[in-house]
Amino acid sequence: MELNFEKPLSLLTLDEIDQQEGGVIQSFRTGHTSPYPDPADWLNGEEPPPGVFITSVEKVLNWSRHYSLWPVMFGLACCAIEMMCMAASRWDLARFGMDIFRASPRQADLMIVAGTLTWKMAPWLKRIYDQMPEPKWVLAMGACGTSGGLFRDSYSVVPGFNLVVPVDVYVPGCPPRPEALMRAIMDIHEKIDKTRILKR
């Protein structure tokens, strides 16, 4: 059954549209029940034609996540300046697919936390982390982010972001250079490539 385009869509009632769409869906269900053939059967030992590749859904999803990281910036101190340098034209962050920093954590999958975190600010870091959709990664930037840095013994400083949120990659330095941050992003890429979607 095909959709009837003799009448303009604006003149059809919702019931008529639903009925026609239901018929098309039902024809797909009944007409396309044969299983997808094994590639070995239709390739006959030959190479696939140009433009065709065979892979798993897991690899495709990891590939797309690898090349489209959407970072949210949580800059707290001097390390954030180096993060801004990395986003400038000299280091060309766009080649990693993350040229636009997101304003909302709900649109991001990578949080780059840079600088000194105080206990008063820690609940806000956790709140932003909780607002990010899965899968999500956290990159701790600088000595203050990894261990508290120069202010470690202060009563008000969190000695490492891992006490508040799970951290995937640490970037040492005070402040770390943009090259170190780019290396950490490549480490995140490697971690994404090894992510298992289906548990076996």
From Swiss-Prot:
Cofactor(s) essential for the protein: [4Fe-4S] cluster
GO BP, sorted A to Z: aerobic respiration; electron transport coupled proton transport
Membrane topology: Peripheral membrane protein
Amino-acid positions noted as binding [4Fe-4S] cluster in the UniProt annotation, renumbered to this chain: C78, C79, C144, C174
Gene3D superfamilies in alphabetical order: 3.40.50.12280
Subcellular location field: Cell membrane
Enzyme category, top tier: translocase
Chief location bin: membrane
Swiss-Prot/TrEMBL catalytic activity: a quinone + NADH + 5 H(+)(in) = a quinol + NAD(+) + 4 H(+)(out)
Co-factor binding comment: Binds 1 [4Fe-4S] cluster.
UniProt key word Calcium: no
Family statement drawn from the similarity comment of this UniProt entry: Belongs to the complex I 20 kDa subunit family.
Subunit structure: NDH-1 is composed of 14 different subunits. Subunits NuoB, C, D, E, F, and G constitute the peripheral sector of the complex.
Protein name, as recorded: NADH-quinone oxidoreductase subunit B
Originating species: Dehalococcoides mccartyi (strain CBDB1)
